[in-house]
């Protein structure tokens, strides 16, 4: 087997493992379908790892596709990332029994302090109190990425198809999206800190780290690969093979491998055990609520 065949075989194996663990976890939720509102959001989140793996694998198979094709593949991952962030917030709201539309703050937590960190303190007071307005603001900070990401993807694909896509537009859109996703993730962190006590039984930190880990690795390894290509560490030895294609290939291989670990981690973070009919803690909590 030549190196290309070994890479393709290894990537195929990784994708199969990622899909296996994810589908197994989804089937466990379906078989223990107790709280549809929560579990629908969880299933959408679980699908993130296999979708990233399959998307990257398609990029490896069609290694010599057009630039527009690869932009389309990246857009699928990133638009789904926006959906996952929105669903994660919806899941947290569901755990707290807070309406996304009404933004009603329960009396027992109204007035809690929210401590902002730099650079958010340039636009917000260092310390604010939780009320209807701040809860709505956190929701808007999350949803702006959900709206902006698909819009930017459509713009990028259209400009590339029309062959009007200078590098400065690419960098401008990249910066805008990075600021946007950072704000969305920041709002989720603030939301977690405000409701940490109430969310503790649901292991929100492990759930959030699962999402942030996928976003973090995919973004920063892309930056590192860009720097390595700029510094000449990644280079092409063939006239028919561009550095960009090699860089894209490395990124896709890494994503296929990483999604194996995230799909395994998801079995802990988004376990179906709390919804199992045999789960005693679930039964006790139901009795208390009654």
Language model features with spans:
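Hydrophobic alpha-helical transmembrane segments of multi-pass membrane proteins
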Residues: 10-17, 57, 72-79, 131, ...
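Juxtamembrane interfacial secondary-structure elements that flank transmembrane helices
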Residues: 22-36, 60-68, 86-112, 226-233, ...
